[in-house]
């Protein structure tokens, strides 16, 4: 069996990483592992990490149904870098373990890993090729405010918590610019996908 090619998809918040991954899955049948989905699973009610979070912040961090109030948690961790570091130290190892398990059991030649904090968490070694999905800062801020219903201040805090997009672009193997229509973004994905496995880089 040939070695699994591991594609990492990252980029700034609200730049379109999930859109790119969804297209890869629909158009090419590429299996997708999304770190954000895994992060929600590892903090589900009853998990050790869930309990650690409740122990640290109290029952007020939970909704009425017992699940974590992600908005409230976000307010805390994005305003206090040390709290964000603590939370990431709980979640990241569990998410990486889940991704490694998914890769170990994958029977396809290619798997895409959507990892928003790929560079920040120093996970470059987990993948063979890195796509960065990018959009201009003002467009990114507007999308984030609309998507997550955030104030400009709260959205700015979230953007400031990540590595600058310019640095992610510098470290990318391929850059996909999400600045126009979906069709234009998909054309870039098609071109980048055609180069995978050939050692090709684009963008």
From Swiss-Prot:
Cellular localisation: Cytoplasm
Catalytic activity: 3'-dephospho-CoA + ATP = ADP + CoA + H(+)
Presence of the UniProt keyword Zinc-finger in the record: no
Gene3D superfamilies associated with the record: P-loop containing nucleotide triphosphate hydrolases
Domain of life: Bacteria
Pfam families documented for this protein: CoaE
DPCK domain location: 6-203
Enzyme class per UniProt: transferase
EC numbers, comma separated: 2.7.1.24
Sequence positions that bind ATP: 14-19
GO CC annotations, alphabetized: cytoplasm
Entry GO MF terms: ATP binding; dephospho-CoA kinase activity
InterPro entries found in the cross-reference section: Depp_CoAkinase, P-loop_NTPase
Biological-process GO terms, alphabetical: coenzyme A biosynthetic process
Function: Catalyzes the phosphorylation of the 3'-hydroxyl group of dephosphocoenzyme A to form coenzyme A.
Record PANTHER family: BIFUNCTIONAL COENZYME A SYNTHASE-RELATED (PTHR10695:SF46), DEPHOSPHO-COA KINASE-RELATED (PTHR10695)
Assigned protein family: Belongs to the CoaE family.
Protein name, entry field: Dephospho-CoA kinase
